[in-house]
Amino acid sequence: MKFLVCIKQVVDTSKMEVDPETGRLKRNNANSIMNPVDLNALEAALSLRDRIGGTVTVITMGPPQAEAVLRDAVAMGADDIYLVTDRAFGGADTLATSYTLAAAISKIGMPDLIFCGIESIDSNTAQIGPEIAATLGIADVSGASFISFEKEGGLIVTRQNGSSAEVVELKLPAVVTVLPELNKPRYSSIKGILGKGDAELHIITAADLDIDTARIGIKGSPTQVKRVRPVVPPQKENLRIEEKDPQESVDIPVSYTHLRAHETK
């Protein structure tokens, strides 16, 4: 069984900045990590591989430094890693990104099952998984909270739909995006950490793919951030009481609250 996991290197949200001129995230000189829920997607693939056999391939699209999260995936147990990187891919929105990733997946070879985290912490669109499935012409289920693999080759997925849950049966190949509550990602082994630097890194560039260059990078991205502004939380109105008489200190806030209640009616 061939499993493939799409992961993303993201800026640590505590260090995140947006370029006000371009409306894009500043990724240089910022702390970067693997998107947290992508760890759950990777764990889902590794767990199934350990149970039924197969291989786990991990892919990411990004700048050369995104290699770091692929090495982290190797430390957890991934078998093969692919970095899709090219200046031509820069500035891609979800549509251009999913198109490029789908082309890279086709080049690698169609897996039986593709896992993605449901969304990234730097954009929260939850679009990449479904768009990859649509581009490849295969089924997808988003928001998986439980997965059961059937012997006949099908997949039973429980997905959250608001306050209710749906049970979906999938025929492979398919894409599944997962929720954090699906599992608890394993820790990297000492052997994995020591050996992650030795794993072969496969590089895929624009020249390696059979793609329409008008559909990649900024040119292929109809979605643009037009304005970025800080959100200032509303200030609460404060009342300071400076009365020596304890009874007056009690009467004042009661009267003030009574007055405000009438003003808001």
Question: Which residues fall in each region the model found?
Answer:
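Conserved small/polar residues in nucleotide/adenosyl-binding loops
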Residues: 257-264
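A glycine-rich helix N-cap at a beta->alpha junction
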Residues: 69-95
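A charged, well-structured terminal subsegment
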Residues: 169-197
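N-terminal beta-strand-loop-alpha-helix module at the start
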Residues: 1-61
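Short, acidic/small-residue loops that bind anionic groups at enzyme active sites
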Residues: 134-152
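Short Gly/Thr/Asp-enriched flexible loops that form oxyanion-binding sites at enzyme active sites
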Residues: 123-136
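Accessory alpha-helical/coil subdomains and C-terminal extensions
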Residues: 198-238
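Anionic-ligand binding region
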Residues: 153-173
